[in-house]
Amino acid sequence: MDYLAHLVVQPLIQVDRRVFTILDPNLNRGLPPFLTEKEDVGLMIAQYTISSLLNRISLLVYPSTIFTTPTSASQEDHVSNSYNAALKSLEIMDLAMDIAAIEYLVSSYALLKRPWFDKTSSMVKRFVKELEPVFNKMFEEKTLGELFASSKKILDRLSDELLKSLEKKKDLL
């Protein structure tokens, strides 16, 4: 379980860098600052949130197996750590899905602002269009936390659909 936790961290750092690039007008090749036309914070909070979640993950990735407690007449030592390692890994995976949902929201919104969006693949268009109800409420009364949660639900549903589709194709092979 400790290895799983470590495996997830580097891709999440890359997600943070991608979101940072999308929101920074000096790096995003023509998108508005923080993806808003207004003098507003826009989606700046999205990157703060990812950074905060990554900080939490950095605390959780410290290996549970560093400390061993011999058990069973010294026959077992790492078994006593597996419960905590599993709990930490579950929390990390949940936080990773939160980060993925935020990236999904930010990157999809950025894609919609690109003039060439209509030339993207049908799959990309479908994933972006799934978020249209969320985008319509983006800068209104909803909090970004509610929008991130909506994005996560949509991402969960789409990933389930994708897995089912892949399982069907696997059976055909």
PLM feature spans:
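C-terminal auxiliary extensions adjacent to catalytic cores
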Residues: M1-L173
